[in-house]
Amino acid sequence: MAVQQNRKTRSKRGMRRSHDALTSSTLSTDPTTGEKHRRHHVTADGFYRGRKVVEVGDDE
């Protein structure tokens, strides 16, 4: 079983944990519908950058 040879300091522990924080996804507003969506993703209505790119049908 692996056991550390020397104790890691609080500073080194903090440096390692500095990349663990969660970030929220950036939202944009579609100019056509005014709907919020993730950046660089198609909206639920099928619009991307103000143009209709996907035909959305009802799910059955």
From Swiss-Prot:
Gene Ontology CC annotations of this record: large ribosomal subunit
Record flagged with keyword Ribosomal protein: yes
Organism of origin: Teredinibacter turnerae (strain ATCC 39867 / T7901)
Key words of the record: Ribonucleoprotein, Ribosomal protein
UniProt biased composition (Basic residues): 7-16
Gene that encodes the chain: rpmF
InterPro entries (alphabetical): Ribosomal_bL32, Ribosomal_bL32_bact, Ribosomal_zn-bd
Organism lineage: Bacteria, Pseudomonadati, Pseudomonadota, Gammaproteobacteria, Cellvibrionales
HAMAP family, sorted: Ribosomal_bL32
Name of the molecule in the record: Large ribosomal subunit protein bL32
PANTHER family cross-referenced by the UniProt entry: 50S RIBOSOMAL PROTEIN L32 (PTHR35534), LARGE RIBOSOMAL SUBUNIT PROTEIN BL32 (PTHR35534:SF1)
